[in-house]
Swiss-Prot record:
Epimerizes UDP-galactose to UDP-glucose. GO terms for biological process: lipopolysaccharide biosynthetic process. Pfam families: Polysacc_syn_2C (PF08485), Polysacc_synt_2 (PF02719). This is UDP-glucose 4-epimerase. Keywords: Isomerase, Lipopolysaccharide biosynthesis. GO terms for molecular function: UDP-glucose 4-epimerase activity.
Length: 341
């Protein structure tokens, strides 16, 4: 898959970068690959990763996706790009929406333009369920990032850079997510703060996130969006599962929804479900390749029209308490926290 190829991961010191590098370093992929470039703006995280992983095939580039020159120069000679750099904290983006636009939209524009300029073979862009029917600044910026990716994909001719999008649900135990928060509250003997008990979220592991990106990389065509089917849980059940795993008696306090939060998340809209391909564990949403000359399409007619439900954290498989506990115990993060409890 990556034999003698150079891969770049933007935002490579984040949760996804650590997960995909862990996968590669534990497999034969690291022997096949020529070089992996970690592109990010945090020199301390890069130094920590360099020391922890200590592999000569990892090359570190300081830069910011907001700066076209830095990403363009770092991308010279790159074959494939995983674009993970983003601002992803919903409340923060609500207070600083222009920062979300600068990183998630304009930064993505820089990454994609640099990839096309440097004749990168394929780019996988990481998105989020919050981009579907977005109500918050983070989701809106990611929705625009998706639209930007598809628009650029339409302009790429046969044999040029292939642009694909992967859309995530909630990645369990990723940086800034609720599971580390709950565990810290449990260990400190504090109340577990739950926004809204009936709120549902998809449950996706970091392993799943890597699987999704690699699946998109292997199977993606120009302009495809890929979604992995995932189970879901209410926030209350998730908190109670962690309480039981850690033997906690901490009280639960309901604090109400935060800025920009949705009651449930959607991974595929009903409009996209009408054209999505069901691939078993995944959905593929193909690019709408029509141009602006709509008249000819009205004459030819639509081949497939359907009225379908969205694919949401409310109507996917809902896990009960025991099922959530079982899922959580498969996470390396939970096992490490139990050892240190």
């Amino acid at each position: 898959m990556f034999v003698d190829k150079t891969l770049m991961i933007t935002g490579g010191t984040g949760s996804f970068g650590n997960a995909v590098l862990s996968r590669f370093l534990k497999s034969d992929i690291i022997n096949d690959i020529k070089e992996i470039r970690i592109f990010s703006r945090d020199e301390k995280k890069q130094e920590d990763m360099r020391i922890a992983l200590s592999n000569p095939k990892l090359k570190f580039y300081i830069g910011d996706v907001r700066n076209y020159k830095s990403i363009d120069e770092a991308m010279r000679g790159v074959d494939y790009v995983f674009h993970a750099a983003a601002l992803k904290q919903v409340p923060t983006c609500e207070f600083y929406p222009m920062e979300a636009i600068n990183t998630n939209v304009l930064g993505a524009e820089n990454v994609l333009s640099a990839a096309i300029n440097n004749k990168v073979a394929k780019v996988i862009v990481l998105s989020t369920d919050k981009a579907v029917y977005p109500i918050n600044a983070m989701g809106l910026s990611k929705a625009l990032m998706e639209k930007l990716s598809i628009a650029k994909a339409r302009m790429c001719s046969q044999g040029e850079t292939v642009l694909c999008v992967t859309r995530y649900g909630n990645v369990m135990a990723s940086r800034g997510s609720v599971i580390p928060l709950f565990i810290n509250q449990i260990k400190q003997g504090k109340e577990l703060t739950i926004t809204e008990p009936s709120m549902t979220r998809f449950l996706m592991s970091l392993v799943d996130s890597v699987d999704l990106v690699l699946y998109a990389f292997e199977h993606g065509r120009q302009g495809d969006i890929f979604v992995q089917k995932s189970p879901a849980s209410t926030i209350e059940i998730l908190a109670k599962a962690l309480q039981e795993i850690f033997g906690s008696k901490n009280k639960i306090r309901f604090i109400g929804t935060r800025h920009g939060e949705k009651h449930y998340e959607s991974l595929v809209s009903s409009e996209d479900m009408a054209k999505a391909d069901d691939l078993g564990g995944y959905y593929r949403i193909p690019m709408d390749g029509r141009d602006l000359n709509y008249a000819k399409y009205f004459v030819e007619g639509e081949k497939k029209v359907a009225l379908l439900e969205d694919y949401t954290s409310h109507n996917t498989k809902r896990l009960n308490l025991e099922e959530v506990k079982k899922l959580l115990l498969t996470l390396d993060y939970i096992q490490e926290e139990l050892k240190n409890a």
